[in-house]
């Protein structure tokens, strides 16, 4: 009798797994369908902030900005599937269905170009945290403004930029990551101007739980406890966006990331700092190869390039594969018009884990490098720690990039990117380990001022 009951329980468990398994597919559209919107009236589909950033940089609203036809989405829903996310820039919609046979049904729709699998799994219920008490950092203050983060900021002369009064005020930064556990409770973020949050993976759920990575990343940018830790842009305005699903690695995370950068565009972000990168997934058939690192193959890289073309200054991590068999940068680090950031030690030598280039089409990557070994970060719980990774060199530089743009508002994103590379430590002899080298943000600032005065004359 015991064995029979055990069999029934196992059968029920397997049946439950089967019933709860879902498939998600990326649907590529041939076009966006009949439009009630047009590029002459962007206020109908773009936010005021997104339009303003384009106007400031003389970037025209284009077809890629137009929304996907609601009729198309209704027809997809009529196939019995749920709509998960979409990309207006890349004309795709991700749908979910409890049966993989949906693919053939979708392909029969006249407006569908192609369909590919991006995820398989089950819905996992999330438990919302109910902690409200403030977490205080118990660490002895040092006799300097930056505390334990001093080295990582001074390496790029960020302290000199700050002394000129440029600490990120008026700059909107979107941080795209896996989660920001305890950021809403740690006292080092009490004065941080967080304008809003967005959970792309689990819409409507908090970003302040489930993963600590984004907490550490944000601390490099936004922490503000003088003498203990001050980030590189403590006076900037922040949007915290979760695009990484910590439960596994599937191609759909590229769709989430694309949705995240489009959302960052919609709220008027000037800077994106992303410390996420991909090359292999739980399903090996979907892995990328070195030959795919063209900046055009990976879906996520296409989205990153579009963000750059919309006037957003995108910083992304090179990856931590330098001492693995892969060795190379990850995607979207292969994207042409963004700043890919490698990592160096305190002595400005390449960190052995920092991913290298070149891209498959021969371009230099990473673009630049910042301190990524023994970085000062804040962990959930309010603990100061040292951490390694291009995940941290990226926000350290991104924050100073925001300060530089604050100082030189007459320049566009491409010009700020060029200034950062032009005055880095090995700009005259760039390579595929550190790119143009470690930036000197004060030199970039002075050069930008000089160039600006020439323009005015």
Regions inferred by a protein language model and the residue ranges of each:
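N-terminal domain-start motif of subtilase-like serine proteases
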Residues: 83-87, 102-103, 127-175, 198-210, ...
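Bacterial Sec-dependent N-terminal signal peptides
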Residues: 1-22
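Inhibitory N-terminal propeptides of secreted protease zymogens
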Residues: 19-133
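Substrate-binding/access-modulating region of protease and related hydrolase catalytic domains
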Residues: 162, 224-227, 240-334, 360-363, ...
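Catalytic-core environment of secreted peptidases
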Residues: 184-197, 343-391, 428
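Hydrolase catalytic cores
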Residues: 218-221, 241-245, 368, 372-434, ...
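Gly/Ser-rich catalytic serine loop of serine hydrolases
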Residues: 169, 204-215, 295-296, 385-398
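Subtilisin-like serine protease catalytic core
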Residues: 22, 114, 149, 159-198, ...
């Amino acid at each position: 009798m015991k064995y029979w009951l055990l069999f029934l329980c196992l059968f029920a468990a397997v049946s439950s797994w089967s019933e709860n398994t879902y498939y998600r597919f990326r649907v590529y559209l041939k076009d966006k369908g009949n439009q009630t919107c047009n590029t002459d009236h962007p206020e109908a589909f773009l936010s005021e902030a997104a339009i303003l950033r384009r106007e400031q940089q003389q970037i025209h609203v284009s077809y890629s900005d137009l929304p996907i036809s609601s009729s198309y989405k209704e027809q997809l829903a009529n196939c019995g599937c749920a709509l998960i996310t979409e990309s207006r820039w890349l004309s795709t919609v991700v749908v979910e269905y409890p049966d993989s046979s949906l693919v053939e049904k979708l392909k029969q729709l006249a407006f569908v170009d192609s369909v590919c699998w991006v995820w398989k799994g089950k819905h996992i219920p999330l438990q919302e945290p109910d902690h409200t008490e403030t977490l205080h950092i118990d660490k002895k203050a040092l006799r300097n403004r930056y505390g334990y983060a001093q080295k990582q900021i001074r390496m790029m002369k960020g302290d000199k930029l700050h002394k000129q009064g440029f600490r990120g005020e008026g700059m909107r930064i979107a941080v795209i990551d896996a989660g920001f556990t305890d950021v809403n409770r740690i006292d080092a973020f009490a004065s941080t101007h967080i304008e809003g949050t967005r959970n792309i993976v689990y819409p409507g759920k908090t970003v302040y739980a489930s993963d600590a990575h984004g907490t550490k990343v944000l601390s490099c940018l936004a922490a503000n406890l003088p003498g203990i830790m001050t980030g590189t842009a403590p006076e900037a305005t922040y949007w915290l966006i979760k695009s990484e699903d910590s439960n596994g690695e599937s191609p759909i995370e590229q769709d989430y990331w694309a949705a995240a950068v489009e959302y960052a565009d919609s709220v008027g972000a000037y800077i994106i700092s992303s410390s996420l990168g991909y090359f292999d997934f739980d399903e090996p058939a979907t892995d990328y190869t070195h030959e795919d690192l063209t900046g055009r193959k990976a879906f996520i890289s296409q989205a990153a390039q579009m963000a750059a073309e919309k006037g957003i200054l995108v910083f992304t991590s090179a990856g931590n594969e330098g001492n693995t068999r892969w060795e190379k940068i990850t995607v979207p680090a292969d994207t042409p018009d963004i700043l890919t950031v490698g990592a160096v030690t305190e002595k400005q030598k390449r960190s052995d884990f920092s991913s290298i280039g070149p891209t498959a089409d021969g371009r230099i990557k990473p673009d630049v490098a910042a301190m990524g070994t023994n970085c000062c970060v804040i962990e959930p719980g309010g603990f100061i720690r040292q951490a390694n990774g291009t995940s941290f060199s990226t926000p350290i530089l991104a924050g100073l990039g925001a300060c530089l743009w604050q100082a030189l508002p007459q320049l566009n994103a491409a010009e700020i990117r060029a200034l950062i590379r032009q005055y880095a430590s090995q700009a005259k002899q760039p390579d595929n380990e550190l790119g143009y080298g470690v930036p000197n943000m004060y030199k970039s600032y002075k050069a930008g001022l000089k160039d600006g005065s020439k323009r005015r004359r």
